C-alpha cells in the first residue's frame, strides 16, 4: 500500500498521497516491527485497539524491503539476517535453534522472487546464481518447465516464472535487461 501510494503520487501528481504513504510507512515501522521482525498483519482486538498478530513469514520481511518501507540502513540486522540466514532451503525454520525465529518459508511467487530481486539489488551475483540453480534446476529436470510454487502442487508451467531469466543473465553477465542504461555491474 505504501509503495502504491508513492507510485500514484509520482505518476498522477495527486497532492497528499506522498504524505499519506509516509504515514503508512511510519505506522508500520512503529507497530508491525516486533521482536526484530515484521508481523504479517495487525488486527483489532475486542476493545478496538489495533494490535500485532503472531504471524511471521519470510515473505512479509521481503515485502518490507522490496517495497522500500524498510531498508538495509533502517533495519540492518534484519536485512542481513534475511539475506544470509533465511531463505536457504529449510533454513526459514528455526532448526531447533531457540534463538532463531521461526518464519513460515516463502513460496516461489512472490516471496522467492522478491528475495532474488533483493540479492540482485545488492549485487550478490554468485549467491543469486547459486539460488537460481537451487530453486529452479530440479523443476527443469522433472518437467522441463518452471513452476508457480516450490513444489509441483499447482501450475508446473507458469509463464511468470520465466522472469528468472533476468536474474540468471544478471548473475552471469552483470547486466540487467530491464534497466540497460545502468550498464554492467561492477562486481
Predicted regions located by residue number:
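Active-site core of glycosidic bond-cleaving carbohydrate-active enzymes
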Residues: 2-187
Amino acid at each position: 500500500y505504501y509503495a502504491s501510494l508513492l507510485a500514484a503520487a509520482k505518476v498522477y501528481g495527486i497532492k497528499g498521497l506522498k504524505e499519506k504513504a509516509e504515514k503508512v510507512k511510519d505506522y508500520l515501522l512503529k507497530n508491525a516491527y516486533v521482536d526484530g521482525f515484521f508481523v504479517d498483519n495487525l488486527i483489532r482486538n475486542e476493545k478496538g485497539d489495533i494490535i500485532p498478530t503472531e504471524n511471521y513469514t519470510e515473505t512479509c520481511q521481503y515485502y518490507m524491503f522490496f517495497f522500500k518501507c524498510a531498508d538495509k540502513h533502517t533495519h540492518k540486522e534484519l536485512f542481513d539476517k534475511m539475506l544470509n540466514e533465511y531463505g536457504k532451503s529449510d533454513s526459514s525454520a528455526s532448526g531447533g535453534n531457540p534463538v532463531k525465529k521461526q518464519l513460515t518459508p516463502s513460496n516461489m511467487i512472490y516471496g522467492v522472487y522478491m528475495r532474488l530481486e533483493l540479492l540482485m539489488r545488492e549485487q550478490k551475483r554468485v549467491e543469486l546464481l547459486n539460488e537460481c540453480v537451487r530453486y529452479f534446476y530440479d523443476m527443469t529436470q522433472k518437467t522441463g518447465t518452471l513452476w508457480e510454487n516450490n513444489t509441483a502442487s499447482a501450475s508446473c508451467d507458469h509463464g511468470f516464472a520465466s522472469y528468472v531469466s533476468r536474474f540468471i543473465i544478471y548473475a552471469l553477465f552483470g547486466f540487467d535487461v530491464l534497466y540497460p542504461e545502468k550498464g554492467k555491474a561492477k562486481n
